[in-house]
Amino acid sequence: MKAVILIPARLESSRLERKMLADLEGEPLIVRTWRQAMRSTLAERVVVATDSRDIASVLEERGAEVVMTSPSASCGTERIAEAARNIEGDVFVNLQGDEPLISPDTIDLVLSPFFAADPPDCSTLVFALRPDEREQIEDPHIVKALLDRKGNALYFSRSPVPFMRNNTPSLVFYRHVGMYAFGRDVLQQFAALPVSMLEAAESLEQLRLLENGFSIRCVITTLDQPGVNTAEDLELVRSILRKESRS
């Protein structure tokens, strides 16, 4: 089983301009994400897929492997599917470029179902939330996941799901962690499918898989590692890195 990590990276971002090149204690954000990915023990190769020469240049200067992709991709998974067509591998991880604190163990965790019996079409990660963590549950920028008893995804939503008509203290909500692993054929099938109705409604690419009958195995992680979507996120990550450098 040959696993490859693909990191989609576009320069423009609606909430944080040119965030992939934002400085994080002396290194661009995308470089820190790539360095963390290189520490995975299950993946044999790490490739950044981008449509930006600015991003490609800063990575290539540091020895990273980069593939240039079309600017027309509607989502990160379409971008990595384009790159994967010319890359040998059995399973591909879609690791977002804005995850500079991602743990190599977390990457290996999302890959783990593919190294076990009965691998899924796709795997992803979820993080448990308590019912009283209402701010996160109600935040539309935090995607919630519904799981069946076998750990497969039933649905993903920006809304609080399930709706709590009755008080159920033992109910666990799951926050989706946006990293995926795909079997090679499933990744290409995903890219060939049109944007689905629910995907467009929620602006969640993983719903394209569910609407078309593919399975998504959800692996529970206990590591809460912040990504970078806003200026506030960027400052949080900078403060974490400063603390780590002093320890």
Swiss-Prot record:
Localization terms from the record: Cytoplasm
GO biological processes = CMP-keto-3-deoxy-D-manno-octulosonic acid biosynthetic process; lipopolysaccharide biosynthetic process
Give TM segment ranges.
none
Q: Which reaction does it catalyse?
A: 3-deoxy-alpha-D-manno-oct-2-ulosonate + CTP = CMP-3-deoxy-beta-D-manno-octulosonate + diphosphate
Any Gene Ontology CC annotation: cytosol
What Pfam families does the record point to? Answer: CTP_transf_3
Q: Which UniProt keywords apply?
A: Cytoplasm, Lipopolysaccharide biosynthesis, Nucleotidyltransferase, Transferase
Output one GO MF annotation: 3-deoxy-manno-octulosonate cytidylyltransferase activity
Q: Which domain of life is it from?
A: Bacteria
InterPro entries recorded for this chain? Answer: Cytidylyl_trans (IPR003329), KdsB (IPR004528), Nucleotide-diphossugar_trans (IPR029044)
List the EC numbers from the record.
Answer: 2.7.7.38
Q: Which residues form a coiled coil?
A: none
Q: What pathway is it annotated to? A: Nucleotide-sugar biosynthesis; CMP-3-deoxy-D-manno-octulosonate biosynthesis; CMP-3-deoxy-D-manno-octulosonate from 3-deoxy-D-manno-octulosonate and CTP: step 1/1; Bacterial outer membrane biogenesis; lipopolysaccharide biosynthesis
Q: Family per UniProt? A: Belongs to the KdsB family.
Q: What does this protein do?
A: Activates KDO (a required 8-carbon sugar) for incorporation into bacterial lipopolysaccharide in Gram-negative bacteria.
Mind telling me what this protein is named? 3-deoxy-manno-octulosonate cytidylyltransferase
Record the organism: Chlorobium phaeovibrioides (strain DSM 265 / 1930)
